[in-house]
Amino acid sequence: MSGTKVPESVLVVIHTPDLKVLLLERADHPGFWQSVTGSKDRVDEPLGETCRREVFEETGIDTARHELTDWQLQNRYEIYPHWRHRYPDGVTHNVEHVFGLRVPEALEVTMAPREHLACEWLPWERAAERCFSWSNAE
């Protein structure tokens, strides 16, 4: 049986003006750190709406109060075979759209406990080194 997950997602890099970046440690893969990511809930969901929903769900940060920017970057990557059952039959790749969310300072974060174990604000160079996903590190 095939799944219904939409193979289109967002990656939202949350950062301060001095380029401290928020990273989240994944609960399902301890030791793997990333920015906020998430798939569209439906094919016609606007990407900005996906960003707002995912950022709020994963951090408690309201994007409406800050500067959300579409960086006009996309990553196309192969979906791991063990996750393909979540998608319609025949889907093997996902397209990820990259956004930035500029916040005035390192904000307090309310993590989604089922999704993340820890969070940390790091200078962008250290954040890039720590990221699990190659698309996060770029």
PLM segments and residue spans:
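Short, intrinsically disordered, charge-balanced linker/junction segments flanking boundaries
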Residues: 14, 135-138
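A short gly/proline-enriched turn/hairpin at secondary-structure junctions
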Residues: 34-37
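Conserved N-terminal beta-strand and adjoining loop/helix that marks the start
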Residues: 1-21, 43
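A conserved beta-turn-beta hairpin within the catalytic core of GNAT-like acetyltransferases
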Residues: 29-32
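Residue-level signal for short, function-critical loop segments
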Residues: 27, 39
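Unchanged
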Residues: 40-134
